[in-house]
Curated annotation (Swiss-Prot):
Chain spans, region Disordered: 1-138
Keyword Zinc in annotation: no
Acidic residues bias spans: 47-63
UniProt key word Repeat: yes
Organism, as annotated: Mus musculus
THEG repeats: 172-190, 212-231, 258-277, 291-310, 327-346, 367-386, 403-422, 440-459
Protein name, as recorded: Sperm microtubule associated protein 2-like
Name of the gene encoding the protein in the UniProt record: Spmap2l
Alphabetical list of InterPro entries matching this protein: SPMAP2-like, THEG
Residue ranges with Basic and acidic residues bias: 64-73, 91-112, 127-136
Family matches, as PANTHER family: TESTICULAR HAPLOID EXPRESSED GENE PROTEIN, TESTICULAR HAPLOID EXPRESSED GENE PROTEIN-LIKE
Annotated keywords: Repeat
Knockout-associated phenotype: Deficient mice are viable and have normal fertility.
UniProt biased composition (Polar residues): 77-87
Length: 459
């Protein structure tokens, strides 16, 4: 912005005359500290273009007359500039630097005004070089640096880009929603799945829609174009389709409709059948190098390859189904077999009748009731004695003692009850006393036997 505001004429005025630099910069800064409104600046640009176009004709004639004295005047001005006091040049450079920091922003001129300024540039330079005419020789040569004459190209403002190319009228600015653009610039979390979440603030479009567009009525042509296009049966998709998305081997081949309707000819059916090799062609066929050729089978191998016949006395395995003879099916059971076939009938779940509740289940014979047992039977009938240290089975529920209910836990028991604490796995702990040597070991002296054992074995 600041570099484009410096014109070539202002730079040349500093080179030709060091005394006038400070005055020109000061007057220019004071005039530019208060910028004019945009409409007045545009009118001044248009009026200046017309005035420069009229003044070009008069300046061309003066330029031809002053061209002969150009070399003499420039060399004189160059000498006068070298002979001038150096503090003045420093002041000019300081004023130029202050001008760069203080100079307000000016609107960029249009391309037409820039071309007109480029056309009138040499005329202005010739006029400013007429100040010194005394010190130049007739054969002097002009040497000027390109950095002093080069004009900085003005940067076009956004307002000039939005202007109409013919009328130069500014178009109304369109404001963008910065938040909406940032949301759209972010990549999607998952490819192919749109983000359907809606919350307050992301429903606004990128550009604000005007009221006229919202109230506009659609024409028949736009309604016809808004309808989706009908897909034809001859439509062929652009990308390759697959049966399964996991692999790339199962491609869906495109078969034309006439190929599905047509019938193959007899010639095609004959060619579609596999070839039948003849024995002569197999014998005459050349062997491929690298393959093994087997010899013809011997008569013994051919005889052994024939399957054996079954023996006429061979009986096949018996089937699972058992066949019952006709005599067994037609036999008649006797009454005794029928009685034995019935299950035993139990009375009240017992095999015998119970006379009284005191008597045993099974009846005892009278001889057994009158018999006298021997001493051996009486000894065996007695139960064994229980051991002195025997304790009976404890009940599932027993009372807890008073001492157990009113006991207090000691510090040692609490310490043992706590689980063993371990440090985190990401931290490595080391014991500084691992490589510590005892004082007695430092003062110890090795015996002759230990020294002998410490020496390596000589082989």
């Amino acid at each position: 912005m600041e570099e484009g505001d410096f014109s070539g004429s202002s730079v040349r005025s500093e080179v030709t005359d060091g005394r006038n630099t400070t005055t020109t910069t000061e007057t220019r800064t004071t005039s530019e500290l208060q910028p004019k409104p945009l409409v007045l600046r545009l009118l001044e640009v248009q009026n200046g273009d017309e005035a420069e176009a009229v003044g070009e004709e008069g300046q061309e004639e003066d330029y031809e007359g002053s061209k002969t004295h150009k070399s003499h005047e420039v060399s004189a001005s160059f000498r006068s500039h070298n002979s001038s006091d150096p503090p003045q040049s420093r002041k000019a450079s300081d004023s130029l630097r202050s001008r760069k920091g203080i100079e307000p922003l000016e609107p960029r001129k249009t391309s037409d005004s820039f071309r007109s300024l480029m056309g009138s540039d040499p005329l202005q330079s010739s006029e400013r070089q007429e100040d010194g005419k005394d010190d130049l020789f007739p054969n002097a040569v002009i040497m000027t640096s390109p950095s002093l004459i080069a004009r900085y190209l003005p940067r076009l403002q956004l307002a000039s880009l939005r202007a109409h190319p013919v009328t130069r009228d500014l178009v109304k600015k369109c404001f963008y929603s910065r938040k909406r653009v940032q949301d759209l610039s972010k990549p999607k979390k998952q490819w192919g799945t749109p983000d359907r979440r809606l919350f307050w603030g992301n429903q606004d479009p990128i550009r604000p829609v005007s009221e006229a567009a919202l109230k506009a009525k659609l024409s028949k042509r736009i309604e016809d174009l808004a309808q989706p296009r009908l897909v034809s049966r001859h439509y062929v998709p652009n990308r390759i389709q697959y049966y399964y998305s996991c692999g790339r081997e199962s491609v869906i081949w495109e078969i034309s409709p006439p190929a599905l309707v047509t019938r193959p000819s007899k010639r095609i059916q004959k060619l579609a059948k596999p070839n039948k090799f003849k024995a002569q062609s197999l014998i005459k066929r050349e062997t491929v190098p690298g393959t093994t050729r087997y010899s013809d089978p011997s008569p013994r191998i051919l005889r052994l390859s024939i399957a054996k016949g079954t023996n006429p006395s061979y009986l096949p395995p018996k089937t699972l189904e058992t066949k019952i003879s006709f005599s067994t099916l037609s036999a008649v059971a006797t009454p005794r077999i029928v009685d034995l076939a019935h299950p035993r009938i139990k009375i009240e779940g017992l095999c015998y009748e119970r006379e009284r509740s005191e008597l045993p289940i099974r009846p005892v014979a009278p001889a057994a009731l009158l018999a006298n047992p021997s001493k051996r039977t009486i000894f065996l009938a007695k139960s064994k004695r229980v051991h002195e240290d025997y304790l009976p089975i404890r009940d599932a529920r027993w009372p807890v003692s008073y001492a157990a209910t009113h006991s207090q836990v000691s510090e040692r028991v609490q310490e043992l009850a706590n689980p063993h604490t371990r440090g985190p796995a990401n931290l490595v702990y080391y014991d500084p006393n691992v490589f510590k040597v005892k004082p007695s070991a430092l003062k110890a002296h090795c015996s002759d036997r230990v020294k002998e054992l410490a020496e390596p074995i000589v082989r």
